[in-house]
Amino acid sequence: ILKEMGKKVVAIRHPMPYGDLSIQVCQRFADYSDLDKHKCTIEEREEYEPHIDNGIIVYAGVDYEKILREAEKEADIILWDGGNNDFSFYHTDLYIVLVDPHRPGHELSYHPGEVNLKMADVIIINKIDTANADDINTVRQNIEKVNPNALVIEAASPISVDDPDEIRNKKVLVVEDGPTLTHGGMAFGAGFVAAKKFGAKEIINPKPYAVGSIKDTYQKYKHLSLILPAMGYGQKQMKELEETINRCECDLVISGTPIDITRVISPNKPVIRVKYSLQEIGNPTLYDVLKKFN
């Protein structure tokens, strides 16, 4: 929306402290080669790649004073993108927080999620097209309880693939965003929803095919079953993810991660990417909120 207004937007992500922090003081990501240059993990790529796909430069690192000053040199508007790992390191002109009705109550029971909820000027309830009505109401009530002055926007999160017919009647492996499934507590993501929606014949259980640290992940997170978390906190784990995928007996891989996993591993099966977007329901919309910056 901001780009459509003609604004130059630069995103700043919260710290992803993997590897040698002394060489990560101020990192700039403008294209995919920068992800390789900085030896990004899958988890880092999941945060940076969607911005790059949208033509937005991303900064991250260690020294957030220096990062801010560098970002200011090339931006009209700076977007702090902290995920649910931090509240903003900077004083903001507008604070937008997204809440997930698939995890009702988490907005009050986790730090810094609760802090973000209380600080928000605008709160977006997404996934209302797939969430349970009672869970949506729980989230609404919790917002009213702790931040009644926030502007609330409700939205669907429609999913899409390039060719749904490729999935129909196929035996599939579903790969999902790792942190969402592990410490995020979710049992499924967009890939699983897509497999169901587009008529996969069977979603295989990847557990028997798991190797190394991927096998350990299943032992630690007992709620995981018909999905494979895209764990990749280093080259060794990426190879174990690749081996697990390649051992699986299926027709194709449905990837619900925010990245193109074929950039970092080499699956021996076709990979179909699932994408999702924000579809506001009713008014106000995000455009209404952001137009004051035009």
Where are the regions a protein language model picked out?
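Acceptor-binding helix/loop patch of EC 2.4 sugar-transfer enzymes
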Residues: 293
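Flexible phosphate-sensing "switch/lid" loops adjacent to ATP/NTP-binding sites
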Residues: 1-144, 148-154, 159-248, 252-272, ...
